A protein has these predicted regions:
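Rossmann-like dinucleotide-binding domain for NAD(H)/NADP(H)
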Residues: 45, 51-140
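Rossmann-like dinucleotide/phosphate-binding beta-alpha-beta segment
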Residues: 1-44
Length: 140
């Protein structure tokens, strides 16, 4: 590939990457995509970023991997239950482990511009539907 990137399957990626950033939708196929086995394949120096959806990374398995230093660190702005409850394992890490983790709220879509774009695109799709035109990003 021209930019120097390599195509890799998930298992090879987990074993070799220094930073793994997850960006997949939540579906039957991606629930717990990253769990005990996958975290065990990662290098102890690896950092996991979940920018996908809650449920893609098993939070209990991630907390255990962090507590046992199986991986170096993690960051996420999504949780299996949002907002996360007080018993979420990522909110109950030891003080030392918590220093290796960035947890932020999932608020990317709460800007004025995001809402404006959402309403404009929604209205355009409604008009397109009734005019027999293509509905953009249609999910059946």
């Amino acid at each position: 590939i021209a930019v120097g990137a390599n195509i890799s399957d998930l298992h090879n990626l987990l074993q070799t990457a220094d930073i793994i950033s997850v960006h997949v939708p939540l579906s039957k196929e991606t629930v717990d995509l990253i769990s005990v086995n996958e975290l065990g394949m990662m290098k102890s120096s690896a950092i996991l970023i979940n920018a996908a959806r809650g449920g893609v990374v098993n939070e209990s398995a991630l907390a255990e991997a962090l507590e046992t230093n199986s991986i170096r660190g993690a960051a996420t702005d999504v949780f299996s239950q949002e907002p996360p409850t007080q018993n979420n394992p990522l909110l109950n890490l030891s003080e030392i482990t918590a220093q290796k983790v960035f947890l932020t709220p999932h608020i990317a879509g709460i800007t004025t511009q995001a809402w404006t774009d959402l309403f404009i695109k929604s209205w355009e799709n409604i008009q397109n539907y009734f005019e027999g035109k293509e509905v953009v990003n249609r999910k059946l």
